[in-house]
A protein has these predicted regions:
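Membrane-interfacial helix termini and the short, flexible loops that connect transmembrane helices
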Residues: 29-43, 71-76, 98-119, 196-209, ...
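Alpha-helical transmembrane segments
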Residues: 7-21, 81-94, 125, 171-187, ...
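Transmembrane-helix bundle segments that line or gate the permeation/cavity pathway
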Residues: 23-31, 59-107, 123-151, 183-188, ...
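N-terminal signal-anchor module of multipass membrane proteins
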Residues: 1-58, 62-65
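Juxtamembrane helix-loop boundaries in multi-pass membrane proteins
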Residues: 42-62, 87, 113-127, 206-220, ...
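Long, contiguous internal "core" modules enriched in hydrophobic/ aromatic residues
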Residues: 107-287, 304
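C-terminal functional modules
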Residues: 332, 337-380
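Short, membrane-exposed interhelical loops at transmembrane-helix boundaries
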Residues: 246-251, 318-338
């Protein structure tokens, strides 16, 4: 039962992470604000389009972190407590986004509308790149070590220690972390462009968005394929199920796909959906539903990658400083009682998702138009 609960909560956390990557279309759209929005009217439509969804992304980010903390507290204390500069910059950029939406159109703001929109662009770049880089460490490893004997130390009962003074920023010195960060960034821009096509009724702007889809897709595929191929052919961090010893296994993540055919099927279906949504949007000028195909494909693809990082006797948060300090589902999770209690609460998740879909549908009943922006009402 305990093993089932560990795997169940890794599935929940992975699903939240996958949904978060999809919702980064808000950041991707904002990063294009000055690239696509050459007029004030276009920029206002873009800001109001993403402005109606930014709370979904922010809430999912917080929920993802909360679920990770509750189910795998040792990861939370190790990563959030050790790599705190990386996570603080990510969180600060999202707070900057929230402030920008709320204050850019308020009368008498001292910084001016353009400054707040620049903050949105900063979040649109920093958020996806650093989140992608943080997730990449699940496959490349981090610089930390753990000494559980310190739990008995009444003066310094700290069991997780970061191995350098960069506290997370050192992740950006690994080229493969940067590559996945860039892949997530360009994917977010693709998703943002597809979202604008679906959400804004302005031919000139949506034509620019289709060109942005094409250009950013090329860059996304280059970085994404490079990271995936490298990950599948490299050694992975395996766990001996009997002794819990962690060791390097050739082709570990490829082996995980082969030994978990359902996860492999999810990955392949996800990739096909991503490409279908992009391809049909580019080939058929009247097609505006690409965000849904590519969005669902993104969730399935990211979910499958996170599952191979933690399932099948794999260390999901490896340490290259001390291999035996690497975190696994078994050595970093909460107690069985805690996981079981939270599992009962998680039954409510489908109802929350249903409410989100209902709210989304209500907000997007009509596409955003220039006329709507000119008429006033609530706008950013």
């Amino acid at each position: 039962m305990y093993i089932f609960l560990q795997q169940y909560w890794w599935l929940v956390v992975s699903l939240l992470g996958a949904i978060l990557v999809f919702l980064l279309f808000v950041q991707g759209g904002n990063s294009l604000l000055f690239c696509l929005g050459k007029t004030e009217e276009h920029r206002k439509m873009m800001v109001n389009s993403t402005g109606r969804k930014w709370e979904f992304t922010f809430t999912t980010l917080v929920t993802f972190g909360g679920a990770f903390f509750a189910s795998f507290p040792l990861f939370y204390s190790t990563s959030f407590g050790g790599a705190y500069w990386l996570w603080m910059i990510i969180l600060f950029s999202f707070v900057l986004q929230a402030v920008s939406y709320e204050f850019q159109s308020k009368a008498g703001n001292l910084l001016g509308k353009k400054t707040y929109r620049t903050f949105l662009v900063i979040n649109g770049v920093v958020g996806p790149v650093l989140l992608g880089g943080a997730v990449a460490t699940f496959f490349t490893g981090s610089d930390f070590y753990i000494n559980k004997a310190n739990m008995t130390d009444t003066i310094m009962p700290v069991i997780s220690h970061w191995g350098n003074g960069w506290h997370g920023l050192d992740a950006l010195t690994n080229i493969w972390n940067v590559i996945l960060g860039l892949a997530v960034f360009f994917l977010a821009r693709v998703l943002g462009s597809l979202y604008f096509i679906n959400n804004i009724d302005d031919k000139e702007l949506t034509d620019k968005c289709r060109r942005a889809v094409r250009n950013n897709t090329v860059l996304f595929l280059v970085f994404f394929l490079a990271f995936v191929i490298r990950t599948l052919v490299s050694d992975g961090f395996a766990v001996n199920p009997d002794t819990q010893e962690i060791y390097m296994q050739p082709y570990k993540y490829l082996t995980n796909f082969i030994e978990m055919p359902v996860v492999l099927a999810l990955f392949l279906i996800g990739v096909v959906l991503v490409l279908f949504g992009i391809g049909k949007t580019l080939l058929k000028k009247t097609f505006d539903k690409g965000i849904w195909f590519t969005g669902i494909g993104t969730v399935l693809t990211v979910l499958s990658l996170l599952l191979i990082a933690g399932y099948n006797n794999t260390a999901y948060y490896p340490s290259y400083t001390d291999l035996q300090s690497s975190l696994t589902l078994a050595n970093s999770c909460s107690s069985e009682f805690t996981l079981k209690t939270m599992a009962y609460v998680s039954i409510l998740v489908p109802f929350v998702i249903a409410y989100i879909f209902y709210a989304w549908h209500s907000i997007d009943r009509h596409k955003i138009t220039e006329k709507e922006m000119d008429e006033g009402g609530h706008s950013y």
